Structures are given as C-alpha cells and as structure tokens.
Amino acid sequence: MKKKLLTLTLLLVLVLAGCVKTKSEVESEGKGDDSKGGVNEKVQIEVLGMGSGEEDLNIVRDQLIKNGFDVKLNIQPDYGTFSAQKDAGNFDLALSSWTTVTGNPDYAVRALFKSDGANSLVDDAKVDELIDQASTETADEYTKTYQQLENQLVTEKAYIAPLYNSFKAQGVNKEVLNPDTVRLAKSRAIAWETIDFKDAAKRTTEPLVSQQAIGDLTSLDPIKGNDGSINTLNTNMYVRLVNLTDEDEVVSDGSLSHNYATAEGNSDYYFLLRDDINFASVSNGKANDTGERVGAEDVVFSLERAKDKDAVPDHRTYSLHERIKSAEIVTDLKELENTKQSGTDETILETLDNGLDTKLSEVVENKTKADNSKGNYQVVKVTTTEPFPQVLNYLAHQSAGIVSEKQVKSINTYDVASFNLDKDIPYGDQRTVTEGANYNNQLYASGPYILVKKNDYQADFVKNPAYRAGSEFEPKISNVTVRFIDDADSALSALRNGEIHLFNGVPETKYDLVEKADNLLLQKSDSNAVTYLQFNTAGREVSKSENLRKAVLFSINQDEFLNYYQGNKKKAYSTVSPLVDTGNELVADSSKVKEFLEAYHKE
C-alpha cells in the first residue's frame, strides 16, 4: 500500500512539474510575444473603407488571406465616419480613390504624396524632389521623372498598393435630351451650358434634372472646396481663364479668354480677356444681370487669393496655386510686342491676336474701358515661381474660378485669424442659399449659371442672362435642378424612371441595365480615376516595415479586380497611370510575399 502511495505521489509531482513553466521558458516565450506574432503566426492587417466600396474590400481581404494574412475589415457607412477613423489612425490600409480633375500629372501626386500635401501621409525627401522636378518639365521630358517617382512611391517604399483605373460613364435620357449635346470629359466636371433638350421648345419651360451624391456643400467660394459636393456646381458658376477639352487639352474655348500665350522660359503666361460676360446675382428667385463686367481686376483678385493660404479660413486649394508668384494687368503693349512665344518665332502679341475679329491695338487697365470691337482689350499676366507649364491645367480647375472683387470684399469683412463660424458668414457659405430663416443669397456668378436656392433634396440653378449672350456658349437651358441622391442604385432607378435626365457615375456592374433600356444611352470614356490602398505611415507595424508593406503589395492581384468588373477597369501603378505611360505594372507574386514576410519577422 505504501509502495502504491509513493508511486502515485511521484506521478503527481511529475505531472505538476510538466504544467509549471520554468523561468527560461517564460523569458523565451515573452521574447516571441509581440505585435508581429510568431514566425508561424499570421500577421493581422486592418483594412478601412466605406460600405460603397465593400466589393473591393472583400476582394482585398480574400487576396490577403490567401497569402497568409489575418484580415480585419473596418467598414464605415459614409465618408464622414470613414474620415474620422482615418484621422484616428484606426487602419493599416485605407481604401482610397483619386480623380485628377485638372488633367495633369502634378495634380495627381502633389496633394497626395508630397510631404506638405493637403492629403499626404507620405514624408519622403526623394518623393518630394521628384514631384518638384517633374513639375518644371514639359510633357516631352517628364515621363522618365514620373517613372522614377512611381519606383520610389510603389516599387521601393510601397507607400501605396494600386488596385485599378476606372472608366467614366454616365447615363443619358435620350428621349428627353439631345445626346450629342451632352459632354463626357475625361477630367473636368460636366458642362451644363452645351446641353439641350431634344425638343428645343422646352428650354425655358422645363429644367434639366441632374444628380450628385452629396448635398452638404463645402463652400460656393471656389477656393474653399475641392470635393464632390461642389466641383460640378462651382465649375458651372464661375468662369475661368482657360478650360479643358474632353481629352484634357488646355483651350480658351468657353473661358474668359479669347486666347492665351506662354512666354519663353515657361514662367510667364498671358491671357487676352473677353468683354461679353457680366456677373449675375439673385433676387426674388431670379438671376439678374448686375451690370458689372467680369474683368482683369477680378482675375487678379481671384488668383491672388487662390495662392494665399491665409486669404480665407479653411482654404482648401492653395496648394494647387502656390506656384503662382503674381498676377497682374498688362499696361504696356510693347511688352507683348517684344516677348516671344515659347517654342516659336511668334511674339506674344501675334499669338494673342490669332483669330480675332478685331486685332489688339490697345491694352486697358480698367475693365469698364475695354471694348473688344474697337481693339481695346484687357490682358492678364500670370508669373510662376519657376518654370511650370502645368499651371495652365490648374487655371482650368474650378478653384481658379473668377469671383467679383467688389462683392467678395463687401462680404468677407471678418478677421481671418479670429474667424468664428457661428457668427461670421463668409462668401459662399451654403447657409446663405439654403431655404429657411437664414436664406440671404449673396452669390455673384461669373459663369453660365447661378445657384438660386437649395434644401436637403436638391439645388436649383438659373441661367446667367449676361453670359456670352448670343454666342454658341450661351446656355441653352434656362433652369437646372441637381437632385441629391447618395445611393448609386437609387440614382440609376431615378434615371430609368425619368425622374432625372442625367446620371454621371453609373457603376461598372450596372452598365448593362442602361444599355438595355430603350430610353437611355450609356456614354463611356477613359478617366483619371484611380483606386488604391493607402498605407498608414504612423503608429502601425506597416508604418515601420517596408518588408511588411511589400508583402501586402505583392498580394494584390489586379486581374481579379478586372474580372469582377467584367473588364470595365484597367490596370494602374499609381495615380499618374492614366496620364503618363511609365511602363510600370504590378504583378502579384506569392513567392515575394513569403520572402518579404520572412524578412519582416526577422526585423
């Protein structure tokens, strides 16, 4: 009996000994217990996005899981909550998208990736250097530089993981609108002034009904907004010095300029102004001709405030115009006669004179003295801080829209440093055009239309009676209504039911519904929209480890995105891809994923 008890006691001691960890074992396990996980453990990646991008998020998740990651999706219902999560740093990867609305590659990278960019999470001296270098080069020169930029941004550092380049598509009710008058541009927002009804008799009796997703308008002051809530609206409310064609060529058509010219050295740019546009205002629900001409004084004022980050509180577009050194009115005709046009033997005067009914014989400083029919014109000279040919694209952007110096100064009397949104009402504040007790429309529009009023459901615009009257650019339709429909399926349903005439942004997976509808036409073109994954560059493992970022990068299989979207996407390497053919391509490689993950675990 004693022998049995002794045996049981010994067994119990052995069992207990096996359950107790030694000091060395505890220390050993503690060293391997970090945020990376063990060598054989899966690395967790948190992917942030919105419900509208759930299909993309699911594809990304599946690709990462397939390559050995443990994936957590952080899906937010709207842009506001998405931004809050992003600002709080609650992500490793953020599903992001960017559309280069100016049609030039500098815009595709400066705000996103330069250290001081308004939307940048990247702080890399080499990236900064390459962005600045490319900006001074012409289209014939900058391809190599942008290729080097992509190599640093994606290949070497993996700050982003590209997914695809989208097409641009809109549905048009061809039974109501004349489809030939509806433009679909690669970059710029849709221009309303060219659109016409199939039955021209409806021009003054019925509104053109369009749609946009966001009804909370950032600002109707061009320099205070650069997002989907106002890009189309401000584009149609404020004329600019130049415009973009549907293929992203800079032209003077439909702008405030007859012609423009670039001086030798690519730092001085001259614009010959028209005299047939007045500002419009609103009273009693109607648009009125103020009698105030849109002139060079307003251009200089608008561009000077556009480039000055302290011109207004919450200036959101100054980085687009920071390369402007000055804007001034030309007062000496000899300057135009003695300055050569870049790349030619022509003078600036000869270039500006091209195609005019009445040649330029005198430059005038005061806009009230301009009379183009007599040869008296205003000329504005824009000088950049360094050679910067792409400045013309920025001048075509809605943020370079021309506002009335007199009107804006009369409203913006507050002190910028002590601005208080609760008591100070700045020019372009949406509260002034929103139906209700605070309605007090003080807008002055230089473009083809002016916003009369808005509510939670729509915004109503009226034709500017003093915009290019009698010319081909006079707006065809008198009234435009923009419905606020944030869901793409609901917008498509409204188009199919005839509630709206135009839907810009038809989802790729719904093209067939538009194409099969007897009353609709699908317009489709290339676009500058790129969707990509933005890595968190602060406070996460992906922030510290290039190896981990590269493991994620080579997990991305773009072919699977193209297949899901039935070929209605294209491959991309960065936000530059739609604009410059660098030859770079992302190829998924599971062996590289394994290699970089192993290197990460050894760090």
Spans of model-derived segments:
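Gly/Pro-rich hinge or "lid" segments in bacterial periplasmic/extracellular proteins
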Residues: 24-27, 228, 232-235, 246-247, ...
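N-terminal lobe/hinge region of extracytoplasmic solute-binding protein
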Residues: 210-264
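Aromatic- and charge-enriched surface segment that lines or borders ligand/interaction sites
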Residues: 259-336, 369-370, 375-381, 542-544, ...
